[in-house]
Amino acid sequence: MLMAGQRGAWTMGDVVEKSLEGPLAPSTDEPSQKTGDLVEILNGEKVKFDDAGLSLILQNGLETLRMENALTDVILCVDIQEFSCHRVVLAAASNYFRAMFCNDLKEKYEKRIIIKGVDAETMHTLLDYTYTSKALITKQNVQRVLEAANLFQFLRMVDACASFLTEALNPENCVGILRLADTHSLDSLKKQVQSYIIQNFVQILNSEEFLDLPVDTLHHILKSDDLYVTEEAQVFETVMSWVRHKPSERLCLLPYVLENVRLPLLDPWYFVETVEADPLIRQCPEVFPLLQEARMYHLSGNEIISERTKPRMHEFQSEVFMIIGGCTKDERFVAEVTCLDPLRRSRLEVAKLPLTEHELESENKKWVEFACVTLKNEVYISGGKETQHDVWKYNSSINKWIQIEYLNIGRWRHKMVVLGGKVYVIGGFDGLQRINNVETYDPFHNCWSEAAPLLVHVSSFAATSHKKKLYVIGGGPNGKLATDKTQCYDPSTNKWSLKAAMPVEAKCINAVSFRDRIYVVGGAMRALYAYSPLEDSWCLVTQLSHERASCGIAPCNNRLYITGGRDEKNEVIATVLCWDPEAQKLTEECVLPRGVSHHGSVTIRKSYTHIRRIVPGAVSV
Amino acid sequence: MLMAGQRGAWTMGDVVEKSLEGPLAPSTDEPSQKTGDLVEILNGEKVKFDDAGLSLILQNGLETLRMENALTDVILCVDIQEFSCHRVVLAAASNYFRAMFCNDLKEKYEKRIIIKGVDAETMHTLLDYTYTSKALITKQNVQRVLEAANLFQFLRMVDACASFLTEALNPENCVGILRLADTHSLDSLKKQVQSYIIQNFVQILNSEEFLDLPVDTLHHILKSDDLYVTEEAQVFETVMSWVRHKPSERLCLLPYVLENVRLPLLDPWYFVETVEADPLIRQCPEVFPLLQEARMYHLSGNEIISERTKPRMHEFQSEVFMIIGGCTKDERFVAEVTCLDPLRRSRLEVAKLPLTEHELESENKKWVEFACVTLKNEVYISGGKETQHDVWKYNSSINKWIQIEYLNIGRWRHKMVVLGGKVYVIGGFDGLQRINNVETYDPFHNCWSEAAPLLVHVSSFAATSHKKKLYVIGGGPNGKLATDKTQCYDPSTNKWSLKAAMPVEAKCINAVSFRDRIYVVGGAMRALYAYSPLEDSWCLVTQLSHERASCGIAPCNNRLYITGGRDEKNEVIATVLCWDPEAQKLTEECVLPRGVSHHGSVTIRKSYTHIRRIVPGAVSV
């Protein structure tokens, strides 16, 4: 299917952006309040007089007294200058002076008080401000005024300086301002500067000052999805120059700051040549787990999921989840393959499923109840309705389906899982009965060989891998409607064993492993369950409004996306739910153009430079 | 093209094995010699009497004297036993006793001599053997007899024991025998045992004794191509258990023994999970270069070539060089792609070039003067005659050609090179003139982008990468027949510079980088030249009998294979030459079914389990 696209802008297969925004983010506006004024009580006899303007008059009066050095009862000595002012005014305007004058301190009685920590000019500015509400903040004095205002607790002046600084932010001064905010724990200013640095990271990372950034700030900035980098290598090099700036002091901090560098997203060659060979990295054994995670990700792809495998917003790649084939209303079969990008809220159709573009609809292959999985960013699909042997893999870079070696045993309602960088095809239905056969694929030799068979023959079960073990959950066994058994395979012993059973017997279910739990959904369960391999225990995560038999579930953008399925009345469902494990919240993400069930759903990393012209007839027989 | 094959046995596209064996290995048989006897001199008067049997009679006589203790002039005291014998007999049979009795040593005069280092029973056996030529070697006494015979220099007895041991070799005793041979520096026995261990490695590596193997022997055994392992992982695990057996002593030897483990051939996942994570490996910084080589090989394939990237004989994979397309006699174009395996002396045709199987010959694409290179074991081909833009890649595991993104600038007589895990397309001819444009391919984004252009516009040049730099050699520049310029690109500076010029101006040439030199052949040079990037100097390697314009050259099995080309009379050549850098020898390897020139020639690692049924129509549009 020919897709045309402008350079740099993602266009949808068909316009959906509107529908995506629709029901989800209603903006609320607070009614704005006008400043108070003369308010009459209705019954006419009494008047609540609220003279908003009086405070200004009062203040002018105080200023005039100060100008005439009248009734002044304290002299603030700063450097060589002396400022006479009124204790009561200072106490009213500043908690610092309030504490000084109202508590039983010696200053309470002294006529002349020596003030440290501020220069005369800044004192002059602050006193003028106190008595006139006016002050001239300039690039030259803002830092001194802010520090003094913070010291004497002139909080409104502190905010004024902070917003002055926020406006004046530029690549050269932002780090300095950040340190200022840090030392005086001005949290809102700090947040503003941090998001400025995040947005303008590329211009800032080369500045000298950046190298003096405190470690926590650096750690926080590097964690952000919105960090404006097009290549993760820029992030790695920033961290390394930051450490190299003060090696003795900062080598021990390397694991902490490296934690937020998304090493798996680095170009594999760059990773080997620059990261692996970096002398500091080689001297620091604690970073080993981070290196191993990246090494395994380069070999296996999504089998390794962590906050470091999610592309950042401005990198030319995006984590997307796919809806592959399946069937829709009135049992029509779906040949389309759709990529959904929750971060950019876009939907894109890619190359149709193989053997689905014959003139005669009846000749088209029905990709239903097949199995699918991602290995090294390629989507493998196998088998399908009526005991198929076919195996194809989809390469999203070249947007093509490519056939690989047939399965030894044709099957459907089975599952595929990636474990230790190898694809496993597990169980399913061979047209006669449920089978326990398991096959693994060797990509170099392009051949399937048998692995240890299941303990219980099942079909329409859920399956996924988690920390070097493979889990097969529930499904329909021979001679029974459904089972609650959890079967677990350990490749190091090549043995299957039973783990804690599910809370319910269920089939037509799907599972994904995310962070340290396995999530299961579908069947007649009307709920999302989670299994903890560590504790070998199950728990209910959340109820669902409807049954979702044969729905899809895929981890993407640090959330779980549940797609389609069949409700209690066996109707196809078109909505996509989103479960946010951190916020523990279930939301309806969007509505698909049409309902779908018995489809495949996986996650891949998709290139986002632009859609180049892709010409049919692109692969030889 | 459907290829059928039995399980486990490679069958040729067409029977060729005969022709390969033909002209190359004539076996010679030495005439056998009969033992000497009575020889008459022709003229009848004198007879040269050579009584071969006399020595036996003499020996029996001496034995009888010994039995009767007659004329015995020395008593050898061994433990509590005494052996009286004749000095002259002992001296004649053993250099040890000759030295003892003939030199001015005290033993020369002593009647009774105490003999150390041998037990009575063994002495008895040796003396019987000396006087009767007979001895009974058994499993129980062979070690003691051999040690004594070696001590007393009964060399024929030593050999007899050695061959007894060689016959009796089994997985349990071979290591012991090897140590025996080692300590007594019995080189021939040592060699025999080493080759026994190499042939039966899998059974032996688990034996306890294996862990006591001396380091040099282990190092030697692991180096062998014939080491009987089907998976390189078996070699790695052997080395690690050998080191772990005496860690304190052997950790420092790890880099030395690991040197002969072919880490690049390990399954990439096994490499990350087991090798990278091994505690001893992580404690040993000196192995870093070996790890880096494997990491880069997993990313880039043949850009990294060393003794460790060549599969061993019994592993289910083989290094093969390919002959791709080109043209043959009377300008007919070749659509076939052939793999030649020098180790197994086999030739196999694989999937034909893309777009070459139309009914109408004229519609077929003419794959001539295109460029080709291997990246991550996939063969990339681009452009070709009449300014083509096509780019395809061949995956040998699934035996398919797959189209990828077009070149920005169509070209032919250009070259492709892999550098830093990236494919570069360089210069060439765009139908009008030679160009200096260089493009690089990003596999993830499937797009070509421009890189720094050549200094000199050239076509039909030679090009290769060597230790992180790219070299463009000779070729036809605009306005001149040929050039001798060597252009060098350094990606770290993104700059081209000129290096030492070739000894001759030449075009229609090809180059490969092998170990620390770049070899160039072809054009009208009638010779193979080599360039040393280290010394930036050229030298003549060897003359060739004919010109070989537009021939192919590929490194395989630690040798260089030069294929086809055009001779002085512009006739296509069918022979394949082999240059062995170690032996500095040029040999004619084999003759192809037909001559070929302007073809592509690269090296890949090919799976050797078996040819499974590969069905046409295997890739979706």
Swiss-Prot record, chains A, B:
Residues 72-139 form the BTB domain. Kelch repeats lie at residues 320-367, 378-421, 422-468, 470-516, 517-558, 560-606. It comes from Homo sapiens. This is Kelch-like protein 6. GO terms for cellular component: Cul3-RING ubiquitin ligase complex; cytoplasm. InterPro entries: BACK, BTB-kelch_protein, BTB/POZ_dom, BTB_POZ_KLHL6, Kelch-typ_b-propeller, Kelch_1, SKP1/BTB/POZ_sf. Coiled coil: none annotated. Residues 174-276 form the BACK domain. PANTHER family: KELCH PROTEIN (PTHR24412), KELCH-LIKE PROTEIN 6 (PTHR24412:SF428). GO terms for biological process: B cell receptor signaling pathway; germinal center formation; proteasome-mediated ubiquitin-dependent protein catabolic process; response to bacterium. Found in germinal center B-cells. CDD domains: BACK_KLHL6, BTB_POZ_KLHL6. It comes from the Eukaryota. PROSITE patterns: BTB. Involved in B-lymphocyte antigen receptor signaling and germinal center formation. Pfam families: BACK, BTB, Kelch_1, Kelch_KLHDC2_KLHL20_DRC7. GO terms for molecular function: ubiquitin-like ligase-substrate adaptor activity. Keywords: Kelch repeat, Repeat.
